[in-house]
Amino acid sequence: MRHISPEELIALHDANISRYGGLPGMSDPGRAEAIIGRVQARVAYEEITDLFEVSATYLVATARGHIFNDANKRTALNSALLFLRRNGVQVFDSPELADLTVGAATGEISVSSVADTLRRLYGSAE
């Protein structure tokens, strides 16, 4: 399983800001390491092998962690999709992704529900 680094998470954010605008930066760069650490700890301790569950964990942790000054939801979605692509899953844009990301960020949609939606959209990685 190929994970995302804190530096890549920050680069995803910076690319979003460059492309779509918004307030750059973050209050504490160490928080990117904390988000990535949270994902990797969950994967290790819960022995998660399902790519969609891990991808959903990236999305929820980043969106709810609110580590950037702006573009947290965009960065969260991009991190989830990057993780899937990096691990051999073909991804594409879907109108469902915006509502999914907002629901995950607000806590209305759980990690497992995010994973179910990603699995339905992008199919089995096995």
UniProtKB/Swiss-Prot annotation:
Reactions this protein catalyses: L-seryl-[protein] + ATP = O-phospho-L-seryl-[protein] + ADP + H(+); L-threonyl-[protein] + ATP = O-phospho-L-threonyl-[protein] + ADP + H(+)
Entry keyword annotation includes Transcription regulation: yes
Enzyme class: transferase
Effect of H66 to R/Y: Loss of toxin but not transcriptional regulatory activity
Protein keywords: ATP-binding, DNA-binding, Kinase, Nucleotide-binding, Repressor, Toxin-antitoxin system, Transcription, Transcription regulation, Transferase, Translation regulation
Domain Fido, chain residue ranges per copy: 4-120
GO biological process annotation, one example: killing by virus of host cell by post-segregational killing
InterPro entries from the UniProt entry: Doc, Fido, Type_II_TA_Toxin
Gene Ontology MF annotations: ATP binding; DNA binding; protein serine kinase activity; protein serine/threonine kinase activity
Effect of L12P: Loss of toxin and transcriptional regulatory activity
EC number per UniProt: 2.7.11.1
Pfam families membership: Fic
Superkingdom classification of source: Viruses
Impact when changing L118P: Loss of toxin and transcriptional regulatory activity
Result after altering L82P: Loss of toxin and transcriptional regulatory activity
Function: Toxic component of a type II toxin-antitoxin (TA) system. Phosphorylates EF-Tu on 'Thr-383' in vitro; can use ATP or GTP. Also dephosphorylates in the presence of ADP or GDP. Can only phosphorylate before the ternary aminoacyl-tRNA EF-Tu-GTP complex is formed; interaction with cognate antitoxin phd prevents phosphorylation and dephosphorylation of EF-Tu. Overexpression results in inhibition of growth in liquid cultures and a decrease in colony formation by inhibiting translation, stabilizing mRNA and polysomes; these effects are overcome by concomitant expression of antitoxin phd.
Other known facts: The concentration of antitoxin phd in P1 lysogens is far greater than that of the toxin it antagonizes. Such an excess may assure the well-being of carriers of the addicting plasmid.
Quaternary context: Interacts with cognate antitoxin phd, the exact ratio of doc:phd varies from 1:1 to 1:3. Interaction with phd prevents kinase or phosphorylase activity on EF-Tu. Interacts with the 30S ribosomal subunit.
The protein's name in its UniProt record: Protein kinase doc
Natural source organism: Escherichia phage P1 (Bacteriophage P1)
